Amino acid sequence: MEEVPRRQPGGLVEVEGVFQFYEDWECWDYVSQRVPGERLQRWLAMLTNNQLRRQVIREAQIWMWKHKGAAVRRNCGCRLCNPGWGSQVRNVEL
């Protein structure tokens, strides 16, 4: 008998995941450049735990909705450019 074709990547579930990934990334990119430093450090510390990622994105979306016209405070919101809480635990190799 012939084997049933396996499901190929790129079906509906994966596409939704890809769109969700880009929505989350755009939200983080926008908000991480505009939030106050304390909040950014808290979120960066929370992002070290994979279980808290959705909570961080949700809080970032709420912050973005409440502060629509917030000014840009920094060029980048990454941990490397903004060392702080929990940054000493990791060694970043570039």
UniProtKB/Swiss-Prot annotation:
GO cellular component annotations of the record: host cell nucleus; virion component
Keywords of this entry: Cell cycle, Host nucleus, Virion
UniProt feature coiled coil, ranges: none
InterPro entries, per the entry: Lentiviral_Vpr-like
UniProt key word Cell cycle: yes
Superkingdom: Viruses
UniProt entry tagged with the keyword Cell cycle: yes
Localization of this protein: Virion; Host nucleus
Protein name (Swiss-Prot/TrEMBL): Probable Vpr-like protein
Gene name of this polypeptide: tat
